[in-house]
Amino acid sequence: MNSFIEGAYQPLLSVWRRAFLFSGALLLTACSHNASPPPFTASGFAGDHGAVPIWRKDTNDEVHLLSVFSPWHSGSTTTSEYRWQGDTLSLIELNIYSKPPEHIRARFDAHGELSFMQREVGGQKQQLSNDQIALYRYRAEQIRQTSDALRLGRVILRQGRWHADHTVTTCEGETLKPDLDSWAISHIERRQNHSSVEVSVAWLEAPEGSQLLLVANSDFCHWQPQAKTF
């Protein structure tokens, strides 16, 4: 599932440091939007160490969020799933695709108190320390705040299969032509030239423009959650 852009993470970091700083400004201007975001949204950002697509579903008073960290150059792909009832965190579930793989699960009651925790590394069950739990809770709140800003700022993630005419068949079955810059197009074409199958691409769209996020041989649609079952 590792889907980083080999050899291209530095240019992307340069672009996305500016874009992510600007996403903070989006939160300040989001109040001017009249329409509310749909219940199921996909967004994301590029951090210092990798790309992070985010899927989110808001149902009544519950927020369900899934993020996938894909490292630029080194490290392990990690999926992080969170649930909140109102503003109270109720679930943390992490899958770290390292060697050996690591799985972490923690549940919290209606008052936010820990009710269950387990860490499994290579099939061996372990307990989590209080410091580890505090760190995971902190990360959960950070990704929630980031998701809030991106959602209100109308930053949308799109992904699918790239075609020779520079169009993409998205995971939803639409055919789109991303408004990407020449560097992004050239990078996709270089990656495509070294692949026997159509590469997958992921990009972000916002009122301020579009930016390439990820390119890989693997099928991004295979692990994209669906609104009805998420």
Regions found by a protein language model. Give the residues of each.
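OB-fold/S1-family single-stranded nucleic acid-binding modules
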Residues: 206-230
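Short nucleic-acid-contacting surface segments enriched for D/E, G, S/T with interspersed K/R
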Residues: 185-201
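Short, charged beta-turn/beta-strand-edge "cap" motif at the junction between a beta-strand
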Residues: 163-165, 202-211
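OB-fold (S1/OB) nucleic-acid-binding surfaces
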Residues: 165-180
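C-terminal motif of bacterial Sec signal peptides marking the signal peptidase cleavage site
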Residues: 29-30
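Bacterial N-terminal signal peptides that target proteins for export
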Residues: 3-20
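Structural detector for short beta-strands of small beta-barrel domains
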Residues: 148-166
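Extended, compositionally biased repeat/scaffold regions that form elongated interaction surfaces
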Residues: 36-92, 96-154, 188-191
